């Protein structure tokens, strides 16, 4: 809010959140509903430009996120094309051990595709109506996941700003993760929006739904995570990969996921927290203190 409306950042400056994510080495990300809260011109600015919609200059070049922002199910009403790139294909190197026990280095292509909740059309109607429209996550995935595979993706990771709901599927449903996991070709899901936890190790876990396995950390056999909210946890998906001599194959039965919380308890029962990263704190300290000063402003 502060960097969007109170003290708007210039085109040449990254959002503080993007600075932190850059320091952490994010490879890709998607958009949640709150990214649309400040209108499309501001979104265009903080993403670095390129949004071809009415009322926005797509040629405007700004600092941007610093990593590929992907979103497959929001389209420009003007162009009938995705508002931003629906997916990205990351080329990395895997260091593994061969059958002889020796270390080998092999290339791997990782497809990352993003989806947000169609609720943006209601919550930010004043900014979005007539300028963009949404598609169901399942429909978008069915369209674009095969494209990623055709371009050589060894694995496909779905970034879903949505969660789990056992209701019958609808293209407008807010939390379609249970249904998205059934789309062929998706190897892992990173979920959000509901501010819940998955997998949940509690005695009575949340998301106690058909097809959901908290012990394995899978949704319909697909490894998945939902890391609470506000940085309270880190979601970790561990995919078991096997090289068949020509390509990588995901062994889903041997894959798993987990959450690593920033807060735990020591032997005495006192709260223990992960140590803050001084590098990141220094990157955003000026804006952080300015925001604190603003929220302490008396209003009456």
Put a short name on every predicted segment.
Residues 228, 237, 246-300:
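Hard-cation-handling environments
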């Amino acid at each position: 809010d502060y960097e969007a409306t109170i003290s708007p950042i210039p085109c040449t400056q990254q959002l503080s959140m993007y600075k932190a994510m850059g320091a952490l080495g994010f490879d890709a990300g998607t958009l949640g509903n709150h990214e649309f809260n400040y209108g499309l011109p501001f979104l265009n600015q903080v993403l670095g430009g390129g949004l071809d919609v009415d009322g926005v200059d797509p040629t405007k070049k700004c600092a941007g996120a610093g990593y590929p922002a992907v979103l497959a199910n929001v389209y420009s009403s003007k162009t009938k094309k995705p508002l931003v790139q629906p997916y990205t294909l990351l080329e990395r190197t895997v260091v593994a051990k061969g059958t002889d026990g020796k270390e080998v280095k092999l290339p791997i292509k990782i497809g990352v595709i993003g989806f947000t909740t169609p609720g943006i059309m209601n919550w930010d109607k004043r900014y979005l109506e007539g300028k963009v429209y949404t598609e169901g996550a399942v429909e978008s995935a069915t369209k674009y996941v095969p494209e990623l595979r055709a371009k050589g993706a060894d694995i496909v990771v779905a970034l879903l700003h949505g969660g789990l709901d056992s209701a019958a599927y609808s293209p407008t449903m807010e939390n379609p993760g249970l249904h998205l996991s059934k789309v062929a070709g998706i190897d892992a899901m990173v979920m959000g929006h509901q501010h819940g936890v998955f997998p949940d190790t509690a005695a009575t876990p949340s998301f106690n739904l058909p097809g959901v396995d908290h012990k394995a950390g899978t949704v319909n056999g697909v490894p998945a995570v939902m890391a609470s909210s506000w940085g309270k946890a880190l979601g970790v998906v561990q995919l078991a990969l096997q090289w068949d001599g020509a390509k990588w194959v995901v062994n889903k039965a041997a894959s798993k996921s987990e959450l690593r919380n920033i807060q735990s308890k020591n032997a005495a029962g006192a709260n223990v927290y992960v140590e803050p990263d001084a590098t990141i704190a220094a990157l955003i300290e000026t804006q952080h203190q300015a925001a604190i000063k603003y929220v302490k402003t008396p209003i009456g």
